[in-house]
Amino acid sequence: MSAYFEEQVLSVYHWNSSYFSFTCTRNESLRFENGQFVMVGLRLPGQERPIVRAYSIASANWEEHLEFFSIKVSDGALTQHLQHLKVGDTVLVSKKPTGTLVLSDLFPGKRLYLLSTGTGLAPFLSITKDPEAYENFEKIILLHGVRKKEDLAYYTRFTKELAEHEYLGDLVKEKLVYYPIVSREKFIHQGRICLLYTSDAADERSS
């Protein structure tokens, strides 16, 4: 029995020359906790075995599709092929999600800090769409550090779309703090995520 589901690509979005996202179908038997990851891969001509890599699931566990957020690497064993996906293509998704970056491993508290750079944002895309996160914490502070402003993938989701969500909107407005950070261009939050977290983000900790 195969360890992978065969899923069909539903959409592909290229944020810029460095990052892209894609969605695919989701087998109805796939169950996961927000924040977990799966192995994603492709079967390539001339290759006996599929090429697979670990990818955090960017979609929430209540959504019918799967979403993944990836960097583009021209000589990457998988990403050099994955970045050329088209709607209708087949991708492999492992049947057993794993990972401990999940809410069930955390005690409820006052604040939940989510620190990420680049595609490290992926698991937090699912967690920030999890109603349980807003039930368990008074504030959720998401920091996303990138080099350039154009690298701020999902910026509109956090500045507009989530707040307008039919079910999550009110919770997001009340509890989610989005803190985008750019290190190599002028920006409202400019610098490295580690330095800004210990300085500017301290204001949020003291409030």
Predicted segments with their positions:
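Ser/Thr-glycine-rich phosphate-binding loops at phosphate-binding pockets of nucleotides
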Residues: 117-122, 198
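Histidine-anchored nucleotide/phosphate-binding helix
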Residues: 123-132
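Conserved small/polar residues in nucleotide/adenosyl-binding loops
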Residues: 197-204
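Cysteine-dependent PTP/DSP-like catalytic domain, specifically the C-terminal lobe
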Residues: 133-187
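Short, surface-exposed secondary-structure boundary micro-motifs
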Residues: 43, 96-97
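A conserved mid-domain beta-alpha-beta active-site/ligand-binding segment of alpha/beta enzyme cores
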Residues: 191-195
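Ferredoxin-reductase
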Residues: 2-87
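A short, basic/flexible loop-to-alpha-helix module at the beginning of a structural domain
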Residues: 97-107
